[in-house]
Amino acid sequence: MCANDILAQGAIPLFFLDYLAVGKNYPEQVEAIVEGVAEGCVQAGCAIVGGETAEMAGFYEDGEYDIAGFCVGAQEKELLLSTENTKAGQIVIGLPSSGVHSNGFSLVRKILKDNNIGLNEEFNGSTVGKTLLTPTKIYVKEVLKVLEEVKVAGIAHITGGGFHENLPRALKNGLGMKIDKSSYEVPEIFKYLQEKGKIDEEEMYHIFNMGVGMSLVVNKEDVDKALSLLENGFVLGEVVNESGIEII
């Protein structure tokens, strides 16, 4: 997630540091967590240059842990993305998410609690818990390829606040986007949460990524080239002269 935030500026992730706090240090638990962090860094093409593990008995319950981290990236000033390059008529390309990613879990927990849904309940060939905890997709390597060969006007990392709070970050003031929700299939986990939580569809797009983890804004003539460099990119919508995000 940190690496994706850096990528959204047009920058390259360089290194990552982590902090892990536990109630009791269980080596097998710590090893599994660190392996996950290392795999994320491989996907982001950045190094782990340090970190800290703190054993805090009495503060965290036995078996509980808290993990945080930050990533540092860099780019030449003239290559950083600027919203001033966005304009009406440009095309919005969507990149599929791997699931809920790292946002919206306060609501997810409430939905599970209110409906007495256990994490081990069967869901779509797996379990609810495993589906919800599918690791966040890291887009660094494929998007850097696009940045090298295509003039990208803006990038939005779809995190907390969904489409409505994140897509405008890729645009200059006064512009908006018209999003075609029929351009892709919303993953089943979001339909499940919407049904169980009795949440209005419009509200879902204000909270979750709804199956789109990142978007790129490019000129029409560059769409085919950009799509050829992406694993599963698709045309999500277009930039318009009216501010706000319209989902049709």
Question: Which residues fall in each region the model found?
Answer:
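Glycine-rich anion-binding loops of enzyme active sites
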Residues: I12-S106, E238
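Glycine-/charge-enriched secondary-structure boundary and capping motifs
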Residues: E28-A47, Y60-Y65, E122-L133, K137-I248
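Short, compositionally biased
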Residues: F105-N116
